[in-house]
C-alpha cells in the first residue's frame, strides 16, 4: 500500500532537526501536490454542475469590497498604491463565490505588482448587469497567452509556483453565477480582469 500525502508529510517532519532546509522544500512540494489534487477535484465538480447556479443574497457592495481588500492588504507590496471605486449600493448575487474570485484576482495582482497601483472598481452596466474590475500595473500577460490562462493544463510548471488552475476555477465559478470572467486585451499598462455578473 502506497503512503498518502498526509503520511508523507508526517514522515518529512522528522527531517526538521537533521535537515531543516530539505524538510521545508519537501513539505512545500507535498503541500503543492495536495492543493493540485484539490483543484483538480474542484474543476471536475464545477464542470459537472454548470447548470446548477448558486444561491444569491442581497448585500452592500461597498462594505463587501472593503472586507475583501482588508483580507489582501498583507499580501500587497508596501510600494504599491491600492485604490477602490465602489458605490454604496445593494446587489444580489452569491457573496461567498464572488469573494473567492476577487480574492484570487487581487492576490495574483499582489504577486506580480511590486510598485505602481492595484485598483478594484465596480460599475453598473444596466438594471441587472454589473462589472467588478481588478487592474494592476504589473508586467501584464502577453496577448498570445491571454486566451490560454482560463484553460486548465495549458502549461507544465513547478507546482510550488502555483498550479495554474486558479483562473480556470474562477472562470467556471463565474459561469455558475450567470457571469463571465475575462482579461481586457486592450489594456497595456499591466493586467485588467473584468468579472461581469447578473445581479
What are these regions (language model features)?
Residues 117-128:
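Short beta-strand/loop element within the Bergerat-fold HATPase_c
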Residues 109-110:
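Short helix-loop "hinge" at the ATP-lid/N-box region of the Bergerat-fold HATPase_c
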Residues 48-54, 90-93:
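Conserved micro-motifs of the catalytic ATP-binding
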Residues 141-153:
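Short conserved segment of the HATPase_c
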Residues 136:
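Acidic ATP/Mg2+-coordinating residue in the GHKL
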Amino acid at each position: 500500500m502506497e503512503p498518502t500525502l498526509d503520511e508523507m508529510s508526517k514522515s518529512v517532519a522528522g527531517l526538521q532537526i537533521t535537515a531543516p532546509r530539505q524538510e521545508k522544500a519537501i513539505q512545500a512540494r507535498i503541500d503543492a501536490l495536495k492543493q493540485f489534487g484539490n483543484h483538480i477535484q474542484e474543476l471536475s465538480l464545477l464542470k459537472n454542475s454548470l447548470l446548477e447556479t448558486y444561491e444569491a443574497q442581497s448585500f452592500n457592495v461597498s462594505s463587501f469590497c472593503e472586507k475583501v481588500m482588508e483580507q489582501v492588504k498583507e499580501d500587497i507590496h508596501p510600494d504599491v498604491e491600492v485604490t477602490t471605486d465602489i458605490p454604496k449600493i445593494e446587489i444580489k448575487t452569491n457573496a461567498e463565490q464572488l469573494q473567492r474570485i476577487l480574492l484570487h484576482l487581487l492576490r495574483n495582482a499582489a504577486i506580480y505588482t511590486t510598485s505602481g497601483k492595484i485598483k478594484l472598481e465596480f460599475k453598473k452596466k444596466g438594471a441587472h448587469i454589473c462589472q467588478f474590475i481588478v487592474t494592476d500595473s504589473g508586467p501584464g500577460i502577453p496577448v498570445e497567452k491571454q486566451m490560454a490562462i482560463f484553460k486548465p493544463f495549458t502549461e507544465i510548471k513547478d507546482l510550488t509556483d502555483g498550479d495554474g488552475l486558479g483562473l480556470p476555477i474562477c472562470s467556471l465559478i463565474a459561469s455558475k453565477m450567470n457571469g463571465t470572467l475575462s482579461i481586457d486585451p486592450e489594456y497595456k499598462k499591466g493586467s485588467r480582469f473584468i468579472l461581469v455578473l447578473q445581479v
